Amino acid sequence: MTDVESNATGWSFAFLRTLVENGVTDIVVCPGSRSQSLALLAAEFADRELLTLHVVLDERAAGFLALGMSIESGRPAVVVTTSGSSVANLHPAVVEAFHQGTPLLLVTADRPESVRERGGGQTTFHVGMFSVAAKGTFDVPPAATPTDAERSGSTVALDALTTALRDRGPVHVNPQFIEPLSSNVPSNVFDTVVPGDLPEIVRESVIADVSAAVGVVVVAGLGAGARAEKWARDLGAPLFAEVASGAHFGPHLVTDYRTVAVNPEFADKVTTVVVVGRPTLARVIDPMCSRTGVDVIVVHVGEGVPYRPTDHARLVDDLVVTGDGDAVSREWAIPWARRSRMALDDRASEPAADVAGSLVEDHASRADFARREMEIQREPVTSEMLVRSVWDATWPHDRLVFGASSLIRVADSTVPGKPIRVHSNRGLAGIDGNIATAQGIAVASRQPGNPVGVTRLVIGDLAAAYDATSLALLTGPIQIIVGNNNGGRIFEGLEVAATANPEHFEAVVLTPQDVNFDGLAAAYGIPYRRVETRGQLTSALTETAEPILVEVVLRNG
């Protein structure tokens, strides 16, 4: 910083002050020269506990860290970068946030517009880089005077925050800074900053009336939340809730909905499908919605491109339920939910508790019991065993995150209902940024007054390798659980697998990798456990005091 007053600093102070006074709590700063006024002031705000500061070297990881915090808290997190390629590295998180409907504030310090087409160093075209994925773009010219800087910083901050909340997505703020890039700020100016609440956003709502009746089905996808479960009960409707929908629980939950949806005994009775959010995990929903005579109502949740399975699907913001759902449920939802639970129990790989065996007293019988228990503990881990064990170990005060791999689909079809917080980047379902997102969720969940829980990320080996540098971000109780089946085994289900050259398919589609996860963990100072058996998995899941990487060698895909 210099003693010469910098309009960049004046703008940055007004910008950050306005965000803090309007409910923003977290800022992620990436290193750089052009953004120094924002970065240095963010540190000052953090010293006074006005903001929580997160410093991240990798802009791609920074974007996903901010995304995770916004997903968990509902508050837009701020990401600050310098100019040039650093901005482009935010793009994966931006498009994921857009398709999820998650608010973010992206602040990319730029050189003045006059040098953009003159080949200036570290200068490119920030504006428009995120295309339609940015719900709003503010290209802010350099302030001419300190008064202009203060006015512009405050106005842009409030407008950008309001846009991100109202339109539920990422907003790009591109301030053009000129020298001097920073200056000292009197310490007493921070005394005037008072943290506030997020502004209230009022939206016009389109509301659909739905009557409880046999034939109504509720589908809960990305972003649905607990209201989907309540609507299912009010309507007396079976609930097809994806595992990360926020509605995978309750008496109407049909866990094997992939089978039920195509069962003629069920499908022929379907008259209305209420879809909340965007389903992403099963192919049976589209055909069910496309059946002749089926009315489709989609309750969108702010996602960038709402789910529209048919041209006649109605897009609404809310529902009003009428009729006697209890009477309908006894005939319609409860029988199918009960059949689903019975089918799940029949398929379960979890061993039943041998209560009788544990009570025997003679030596031979107790030895037999101990031998059987030991055999159970020595069973190799399968995908189903992994997700079920993690599911059973997770409580309402914990957070469970699924990466983009076959494991989330296994969980979606095998775990029973349970009211826990489950997240997954299903906007675009990419393998990038999964570890950083989980850390963001973990950080945001550790708020004063909240019970201290553990965040568990269940991730495939490819996604873990792809986001390995985000291991540097890990703090607090978080488990990175890597299901290692040596490559993208989810693609083994593709039709092309039956006709492609096996060696070529293995090399360019499954792409197996030889990753030393023990070495990766050591490089970032994280404890590591290798798990091959049920007993080892059970033990590893109890190690929750600090970050840990658990590599689970899977017997199957």
Regions found by a protein language model. Name each.
Residues 26, 72-81, 96-102, 108, ...:
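Structural signature of the thiamine diphosphate
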Residues 67, 71, 79-82, 88-89, ...:
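Glycine-rich, anion-gripping cofactor-binding loops and their flanking helix/strand elements
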Residues 108-155, 241-362, 495:
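Glycine-rich, acidic loop regions that bind phosphate or pyrophosphate groups
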Residues 12-15, 20, 33-38, 351-452, ...:
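Active-site diphosphate/adenylate-binding microenvironment
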Residues 2, 6, 156-213, 326, ...:
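Conformationally flexible catalytic loops at phosphate/diphosphate-handling active centers
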Residues 25-29, 51-54, 72-111, 270-277, ...:
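A short, small-residue-rich loop immediately preceding and capping a beta-strand
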